[in-house]
């Protein structure tokens, strides 16, 4: 039976977030609602989740020694990775020593690295994926592009939010794609994945929750990506019963292999009734921000319930809903937002401003959420709400 102690006492139940961005912030808020003591880590000061945490630390989480020092000092009950760039070998050792890594050190290690998760899905589990190859030098990269064929997609094996990703549309793009991937990779030592182009009708995120009573699925989330990063999402995305069943079967298979309790964002391509696996994140997914308005339990609430071993008897859908990101371009440490009166004038609209302390170039600074009588109306309402928010630098 779960017992939650008193914060700032010897009985406190502590959750430590490795990553303090906007998704971590929502997890921290859900943890606060249940009386947990929240510690947030990130590589920069005043990150969004730090603003609602009880304590925070600034460090590179790729520094295993520094990460271990904080974890041994805090002795958290739950260690929850919220980003990919973490010293996963250190987490694996800490798990062996008795610390609780969410959902598991194995899941964190494999999904941090596109090579690990792709080999697990395609080679170990036999799940349909796009054609792929890996390369860690320019010569092998050029050969892999030739073998996979053009057009193809190039991604660093370790990156997020579209960093380093590009599409090779002709041989003239090969050099620039290689160099762009090298700039965008975090800790992958220059290695990239080359993926064959997939002919698909649409792509979805299937939020999959592994909890003490089994596995639950949220309604499919459709989304639009630009430059490898999410711009809009909506729920539910219409799918045939056959496609939904295939998607859930694949999601169940991959999440069972990763193990542990928590929410997973499983990304899938759909062509007619055929489902092709793309990626999986063992944590809340950015496209799942729409669940803040579309469901009675958001993806963040579901993640926390699963982590704590609490019941998830059902997930109630409120109706057609959408999200649209607020994505300004500028340079400032004193960003100001206006236009909220216009952004929120329609019923069933919400705004989340993430509280990021700095913008340097283009950065996701918030999201508009909307609900309506149809997906199309919800998307338009969310877009209009996001566009109404003005950003001054």
Swiss-Prot record:
Keywords: ATP-binding, Ligase, Magnesium, Metal-binding, Nucleotide-binding, Purine biosynthesis. ATP binds at residues 114, 155, 160-165, 195-198, 203. N(1)-(5-phospho-beta-D-ribosyl)glycinamide binds at residues 22-23, 82, 286, 356, 363-364. The keyword Metal-binding applies. Pfam families: ATP-grasp, PurT_C, RS_preATP-grasp-like. Its EC number is 6.3.1.21. Residues 119-308 form the ATP-grasp domain. The keyword tRNA-binding does not apply. SUPFAM superfamilies: Glutathione synthetase ATP-binding domain-like, PreATP-grasp domain, Rudiment single hybrid motif. GO terms for cellular component: cytosol. It catalyses: N(1)-(5-phospho-beta-D-ribosyl)glycinamide + formate + ATP = N(2)-formyl-N(1)-(5-phospho-beta-D-ribosyl)glycinamide + ADP + phosphate + H(+). Pathway: Purine metabolism; IMP biosynthesis via de novo pathway; N(2)-formyl-N(1)-(5-phospho-D-ribosyl)glycinamide from N(1)-(5-phospho-D-ribosyl)glycinamide (formate route): step 1/1. Gene3D superfamilies: 3.40.50.20, ATP-grasp fold, A domain, ATP-grasp fold, B domain. Coiled coil: none annotated. GO terms for biological process: 'de novo' IMP biosynthetic process. Mg(2+) binds at residues 267, 279. GO terms for molecular function: ATP binding; magnesium ion binding; phosphoribosylglycinamide formyltransferase 2 activity; phosphoribosylglycinamide formyltransferase activity. Involved in the de novo purine biosynthesis. Catalyzes the transfer of formate to 5-phospho-ribosyl-glycinamide (GAR), producing 5-phospho-ribosyl-N-formylglycinamide (FGAR). Formate is provided by PurU via hydrolysis of 10-formyl-tetrahydrofolate. Homodimer. Belongs to the PurK/PurT family. This is Formate-dependent phosphoribosylglycinamide formyltransferase. It comes from Hydrogenovibrio crunogenus (strain DSM 25203 / XCL-2) (Thiomicrospira crunogena).
